[in-house]
Amino acid sequence: MDMTNAQRLILSNQYYLMSQMDPTNAEKYKRQQLIVERGYELQIRELDKDFGCITETECREIIDFMEMYHAMQESYNMLSEECQAKVDARRLQFLGFDIATEAQQVNYVRFLTSSEGLYPQFDKADHHFNSQMPMLDKYRRMLTTWRNCPRQYHLCSTELAQIFNA
């Protein structure tokens, strides 16, 4: 992150104000203030790690994943009890993404569910959409299979199994 001295001064003052306003996190803000004031470039890079960018295409893809899970859940609810017994209902839960390798995606899902109020039926449980394993490639394979289904919101147990196993 390249900053002029004026920008560093402004940011330093912001961290100072935050340390005064939020005593529980004061040490964190004082540390960040010191990093900015002294220009420690290695540590400055950690300050901008949360400033990510997800393209419109990536956002739409994540929404498509979530919509696919919504469709699978609704399809499951419309199945007879006999057909429901053939489906592992645990696999209908949208797990989210891996916070270690897919942090931007996790944060976007959290934004959609918390701030935007979308998909309230998704159980965030204790993990809050941190799957703790990379999921992007898996979701892409599942999405391809789901899109090939003729009735995407009226899936049978066989189609659900095909999507899960993609």
From Swiss-Prot:
InterPro entries referenced in this protein's UniProt entry, alphabetically: UPF0304_YfbU, YfbU_alpha-helical_sf, YfbU_helix-hairpin_sf
Stated family: Belongs to the UPF0304 family.
HAMAP family reported in the protein's UniProt record: UPF0304
This protein's name: UPF0304 protein VF_1794
Annotated source species: Aliivibrio fischeri (strain ATCC 700601 / ES114)
